């Protein structure tokens, strides 16, 4: 039923919200992308309060439709321009300084969210399906 105005709605926000990408809950942090601005937001999932500074994803030059994914202490954000930014997942309110570990580019366009399986990273581009592994 309708839970608007009930105790079931713990918190809500109406700014800094994503346009297409779904949020990511990783460890004790909720990540989401600010509406069409390539800015990553970190939040406390229980209170809805921001954690630290917002992070502009400088390496991505187009919109981000894919949802961020996380594994092994890293957060992966893929833009439509084929760029994936790899970030260190900071704990708690630790600063996002020096968070960018790598910026990788493929010559394709990505709207679908990546999939992580075991030690493989799958990306579906407009032209190809990619499997990245060590």
Where are these regions (language model features)?
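Noncatalytic, solvent-exposed loop/strand surfaces
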Residues: 1-134
């Amino acid at each position: 039923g309708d839970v608007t105005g009930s105790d079931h709605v713990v918190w809500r926000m109406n700014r800094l919200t994503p346009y297409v990408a779904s949020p990511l809950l990783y460890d004790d942090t909720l990540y989401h992308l600010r509406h069409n601005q390539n800015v990553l937001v970190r939040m406390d999932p229980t209170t809805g309060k921001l954690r630290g500074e917002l992070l502009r994803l400088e390496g991505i030059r187009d919109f981000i439709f894919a949802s961020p994914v996380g594994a092994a202490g890293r957060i992966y954000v893929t833009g439509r321009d084929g760029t994936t930014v790899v970030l260190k997942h900071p704990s708690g309110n630790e600063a996002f300084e020096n968070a960018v570990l790598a910026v990788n580019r493929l010559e394709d366009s990505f709207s679908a969210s990546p999939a992580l399986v075991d030690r493989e990273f799958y990306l579906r581009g407009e032209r190809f399906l990619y499997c990245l592994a060590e």
